[in-house]
Amino acid sequence: MKKISVTCERKEDIALLKEAGADEVIVALEGGVFSSLQTFSIAQIAELLTQARLVQVQLFVLMNRLFPQSEIKHAQQELKQLLEIGVDGVIIADPGLYQVAKGLSLEDKLIYSPETLVTSAEDAKFWLSTGMYSVNISPLLTEEEILKIASSVRHCGIQVFGYLLMSISKRPLLTAYQEVANIEEPLHHNHHLYLREQKRDGMMPAYENEAGMMIYTDFVQESFAWLEPFSNAGIQRFEMYGNYIPQNALFDAIRMYRRVLDGEDGESVRKEFVLKYPELPVSDGYYGQKTIR
């Protein structure tokens, strides 16, 4: 079954996401993510899980930080709590969390998603051989490279919509800039900051939390015309990230992606979306570009 998995930042949106066509919702763990998404405590996630069960949608937790030695024990304990309350899965990037799930015989609840690091079939096969549920392919690859991995390895996923996380620094660079430039407005946990390169017009969302600073692409990844070949090659999970996306555009994108997966022509649906949301800097990203090695 091909599943659409969408980020969720409000409890009241769970039912709406299900109605729009989402099979899974992704919620971010407080203190556990490299992401600008709204985060939730484990107690809050338990409440979200109850709501998800009511509307019959699966709930996955994003926990994609890399944890230093001083924090890994606490992170492992949080993962244990999440698995014990019954979430459908946890999306991780730190291999140090794997042993906890294995000790509970719940390694099949993990999705390995190290942002841009899964770039070959060998990578994906290795992580799936550990018993994990799924592996996310890097979205910064060409169509040819993605199809090669997907056709060789089952149970893969990929981000197909939203701004892509491009850069992470554990240093609080925005806070440092605020101090040097004597800026009064708080830059920490500020969702309204963008970077622009001197010779480019694109605006890159920038965000800082306790884990560090993150920079996103200056384009919104869209994959309307690519859903059919990706699906035919074997990709099973299609992730859609809604941070920095207007809610109406995100919900329309979900509905339109569902239409494509149900058989409509992807290019025609893409044109419909672009016509409706001309202000969004949508792009097919790196699908048609040669990866530099």
Task: Describe every region a protein language model picked out.
Residues 131-132:
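As written
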